[in-house]
A protein has these predicted regions:
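Conserved coil-to-alpha-helix start sites within the AMP-binding
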Residues: 76-78
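PRPP-dependent phosphoribosyltransferase catalytic core
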Residues: 2-11, 136-209
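Active-site-facing substrate-recognition patch
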Residues: 1-63
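Phosphate/pyrophosphate-binding loops at sites that engage ATP/ADP/AMP, CoA/4′-phosphopantetheine
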Residues: 56-68, 135-141
Length: 209
């Protein structure tokens, strides 16, 4: 992993990640969470956006040089995948959660050929469910998945276990343990809040204050 702490610092700086241990957020899954990560906010800050784009491209160049195609996971993975593809001069496609119900009925948008070596681009990974749905759609079309990259990773065992079972080589620019450690060291949260944040990650589906 590159300088995960610096990436985490940038996310906190633009408030792409919000920590609120005493008034938790509710995720779409229904989980109560003391953290909310919205990397889409980074897109509004050109210098931070450019820095993260560069780090993403460095990781792709160093670890996934064999990639001949980048695939963004809709919707938040699309801008990062497109920017990286532009920088690296690679073709780009994106994957919807499910096929369109009108028009051509595509789930994958863009031009590709079976057998191409594709790298999946996510903005963040939590349980890994949406990531694996995208992988399944790509594999069904005959594409060769060489790995996956993201900006942020919650580090849930369920995701890492499923990626390992599928043989997916995964890299994230930063992660949850790095971010909360930085928040504690800079005084954004106190020791009690840090402990609460650590306990949440152990069992997020049943966590309560």
């Amino acid at each position: 992993m590159r300088d995960a702490t610096l990436i985490a610092e940038k996310l906190l700086q633009v408030k792409a990640v919000q920590l609120n241990p005493t008034h938790p957020f509710t995720w779409a899954s229904g989980w109560k969470s003391p953290i909310y990560c919205d990397n889409r906010k980074v897109l509004s800050f050109p210098y931070v956006r450019d820095y993260i784009k560069s780090e993403l491209c460095n990781v792709i160049f160093e670890k996934y040089e064999a990639a001949t195609l980048l695939a963004g996971v809709a919707t938040a993975g699309i801008p990062w995948g497109a920017m990286a593809a532009d920088q690296l001069k690679l073709p780009f496609i994106y994957v919807r959660p499910k096929p369109k119900e009108h028009g051509l009925g595509n789930q994958i948008e863009g031009d590709f050929q079976a057998g191409q070596k594709v790298l999946v681009v996510e903005d963040l990974v939590s349980t890994g469910k949406s990531s694996l749905q995208a992988v399944d759609a790509l594999v069904e079309k005959g594409l060769d998945i060489i790995g996956m990259v993201s900006i942020f990773n919650y580090g849930f065992p369920v995701a890492s276990e499923q990626f390992a079972q599928r043989g997916i080589n995964y890299t994230s620019l930063t992660d949850y343990p790095t971010l909360i450690a930085l928040a504690a060291s800079t005084g954004l949260i106190d020791k009690e809040q840090l402990s609460l944040l650590e306990k949440w990650r152990e069992n997020p589906s049943t966590w309560t204050i």
